[in-house]
Amino acid sequence: MQIEKHISDLLYRYQCVTVPGFGAFLTETVSAHVTGSASSFFPPKKVVSFNANVKNNDGLLANHVALQEKMSYELAVIKIGDVVNEWTYLLQNRNRVVLKNIGEISVNNEMNWVFEPANTVNYLTDSFG
């Protein structure tokens, strides 16, 4: 199961998507801006961040997975837990977790998780005409 696709889908509509037992992906709206030197215009966008301290299951992701994958809520929670175990194992062994269209989580020298957002997707639907 590609859980990152489900997270990505939800980031268009919600400010916070919690992956139970792992952490939460948060979005913050950034205003449009123009660069002076190149006269380039950048539309408003949502910037994604990650908080490893928010781990409680709010049901949002599991409900979405259950509906989209046509499975029970309970099975969705189990499948998400399996993915969380895989990601945690990778990070504990100093590997990176790459989440397509969301970002990359790695471990620094102090064994803290570091999130680098992907800049390939604008989750702010108001930016599109």
Annotate each predicted stretch with a short phrase.
Residues 1-129:
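Cytosolic/nucleoplasmic/matrix-facing N-terminal domains/tails
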